Design a protein with these regions (language model features):
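Flexible, low-complexity linker and terminal segments
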Residues: 2-200
Length: 200
């Protein structure tokens, strides 16, 4: 798990509802099956998800090695083979790309906005407030705030290309705007970047 955060989120405060764990879907790891015993290959992956099968350490017939060095794509033995490393990098990227994430939602004048504000992370509160102030001033404005960055929601391109003007507002030097340009052909947003550690 990689958690991206920023100083505004880390040092801010606000009320939130504590979730009930019972409301979340059950987590069911892909454990090894009895058929795999004595023939277990730790890097064999589920072809649909790209996830490897889990063996509980110490189980007879499922011995394997853990470590941080690159492993053979099937056996799990340490490998320095360049072709294997290339394959493993692609397999890891494909596994992440297969993670299902919800669509990004558009708030405000979602159907007819002249301007779409895009943000992520700790910028949500002040971008939402800015959108509301602009709407009060008679402007048609919408907000798309991203929670998932990799993989991006499947509707990302459709949302971003729907509006005449898109501004990506970030509390950095524009890394998310650059990432979106890389992922979406012919996407040319305006950028609003500040690195002051203060709300916009």
């Amino acid at each position: 798990v990689v958690l991206l955060t920023d100083g505004f989120v880390a040092n801010g405060s606000g009320a939130w509802k504590l979730p009930k764990l019972a409301d979340y879907p059950a987590i069911t790891p892909p454990y090894v099956t009895p058929e795999m015993k004595d023939n277990y290959t730790p890097y064999k992956r589920n072809p649909e998800t790209g996830v490897r099968y889990w063996a509980i350490p110490g189980q007879e017939g499922y011995m394997h090695i853990l470590g941080g060095l690159e492993k053979d794509s099937n056996t799990g033995a340490i490998s320095t083979d360049p072709e294997n490393h290339n394959l493993m990098c692609h397999l890891r990227a494909e596994k992440v790309a297969k993670i299902p994430v919800p669509d990004v939602e558009v708030q405000g004048c979602a159907d007819d906005a002249d301007l779409l504000i895009v943000g992520f992370g700790g910028t949500y509160g002040h971008l939402y407030s800015a959108m509301e102030e602009m709407k009060k001033a008679g402007k048609k404005v919408a907000l798309a705030h991203f929670t998932y960055l990799n993989p991006l929601p499947k509707n990302t391109e459709a949302v971003l290309k729907k509006y005449k003007k898109v501004v990506v507002a970030e509390q950095n030097l524009g890394q998310f705007a650059g990432y979106l340009r890389m992922k979406i052909d012919n996407f040319t947003p305006y950028q609003f970047n500040e690195v002051k550690g203060q709300p916009f």
